[in-house]
Amino acid sequence: MPHHYILTLFGLLPVATNISTWWNFGSMLLTCLALQVLTGFFLAVHYTANINLAFSSIIHITRDVPYGWMMQNLHAIGASMFFICIYIHIARGLYYGSYLNKETWMSGITLLITLMATAFFGYVLPWGQMSFWAATVITNLLTAVPYLGTSLTTWLWGGFAINDPTLTRFFALHFILPFEIISLSSLHIILLHEEGSSNPLGTNPDIDKIPFHPYHSHKDLLLLTLMILLLFITMSFFPDIFNDPDNFSKANPLVTPQHIKPEWYFLFAYGILRSIPNKLGGALALVTSIMILFTIPFTHTAHLRPMTFRPLSQLMFWTLVSTFITITWAATKPVEPPFIIISQATSLLYFTFFLSFPILGWTENKMMNTP
């Protein structure tokens, strides 16, 4: 039995015996966070937050710094891995009703928003062509805010256009936000262990629990090993798979790329933004696409917690997953038919899931004849 209180805490942590592989993503996210902070620190040591030197400093890191290429690729691909894990983690929470642990769910969605902000600021730092124009387009959405929009945008930019002050403050924010993420993650884990994890059956697992270590810790190690293996294979053989070709050119404010788009993990929100032909409407839809996740614990009306035994909810859940993938794909395409109508239809379907959520619960209660 370990004597150190932290080891004892994890060793004796009671966990349901029947949690599946879908519960492994929390530990994978923790590993991704540690990797990002570590590689980010080594990159920050060599990076220069200046519009004339930022792009050159990235080239310097990749070419001249020992193992700089590894740090740079691990940081970029690690961000994609982070988002893959967090989207699966949220999907598992939706499917198995983990959102009924309200405080944990709320802290988790706050974590997602902080992570998205951190990733956005990081995407601007290389000062490539796509970095510059994606930052211009996204920050310009603030001008849609009535009365305060222009003042807010000028304040964020530090001037009347994206320039050196913008890059400096984005670097400062990109450096400080991971510490916010670490704090929120600690809070998330503390809140989770107040009530304990849910399980695939949605039953009260108190009568059948086992210690986290060695049982679940060894189970977690399998997927962790596979994730790190996948990360290193991608880094070694396909290092530029997630990169935009335009970002290999230095930012030029005088030349607009043919098709401006952010990183793939923001494309679903960007696709929803683009599907509405109005600036304020699009900006509101973009914000709502994330914020609507906060409403889920309050719209759960089913008597059963998970979707394991709820066929209608399962159908809508997998429709949501396919919708998410389709919006992401459509957002990579130019704004022209048929991609406009595909984006609009999938955006409507995306919001339909959340709006129909309470109705589905009531319908399923009636189907099961539960009082």
Curated annotation (Swiss-Prot):
Coiled coil region boundaries: none
Cofactor: heme b
Disulfide cysteine pairs (residue numbers): none
Primary localization class, coarse: mitochondrion
GO molecular function, one term: ubiquinol-cytochrome-c reductase activity
Quaternary structure and partners: The cytochrome bc1 complex contains 3 respiratory subunits (MT-CYB, CYC1 and UQCRFS1), 2 core proteins (UQCRC1 and UQCRC2) and probably 6 low-molecular weight proteins.
Function: Component of the ubiquinol-cytochrome c reductase complex (complex III or cytochrome b-c1 complex) that is part of the mitochondrial respiratory chain. The b-c1 complex mediates electron transfer from ubiquinol to cytochrome c. Contributes to the generation of a proton gradient across the mitochondrial membrane that is then used for ATP synthesis.
Name by which UniProt lists this protein: Cytochrome b
Biological source species: Apodora papuana
